[in-house]
Amino acid sequence: MNTLQRLEATIAARRNADPDSSYVARLNAKGLPKMAEKVGEEATETVIAALTGSDEELVGEGADLIFHLLVLLQARGVSLDQVLAELDRREGLSGLDEKAKRGD
């Protein structure tokens, strides 16, 4: 089990814990809108760190972004394996071709 898989398992284990003792449980209690807001907030902080911060700040914000994304995915019933399978599917495809297929 790698770090992301362990983190996903930890998030699952804490999802229904007491919101007073678990940040994951607190996020779940607040619902999808709050989780989505946190992903957006962490994405913005990651971009800012990439443009103006140190490598250490970027690493920290990247970790926060991944954590909050995993919380959101799990709340929607989407597993890390599903996301990794999609990345596997896209491997070797031109990014421009992939975007064209999606109509982006």
UniProtKB/Swiss-Prot annotation:
InterPro entries: HisE, PRib-ATP_PPHydrolase-like. One of its GO terms (biological process) is L-histidine biosynthetic process. Its EC number is 3.6.1.31. Keywords: Amino-acid biosynthesis, ATP-binding, Cytoplasm, Histidine biosynthesis, Hydrolase, Nucleotide-binding. GO terms for cellular component: cytoplasm. It holds the Pfam family PRA-PH. Pathway: Amino-acid biosynthesis; L-histidine biosynthesis; L-histidine from 5-phospho-alpha-D-ribose 1-diphosphate: step 2/9. It is found in: Cytoplasm. Gene3D superfamilies: MazG-like. It catalyses: 1-(5-phospho-beta-D-ribosyl)-ATP + H2O = 1-(5-phospho-beta-D-ribosyl)-5'-AMP + diphosphate + H(+). One of its GO terms (molecular function) is phosphoribosyl-ATP diphosphatase activity. Belongs to the PRA-PH family. PANTHER family: HISTIDINE BIOSYNTHESIS BIFUNCTIONAL PROTEIN (PTHR42945), HISTIDINE BIOSYNTHESIS BIFUNCTIONAL PROTEIN HISIE (PTHR42945:SF9). NCBIfam families: histidine_hisI (TIGR03188), PRK00400.1-3 (NF001611), PRK00400.1-5 (NF001613). This is Phosphoribosyl-ATP pyrophosphatase. It comes from Erythrobacter litoralis (strain HTCC2594). The gene is hisE.
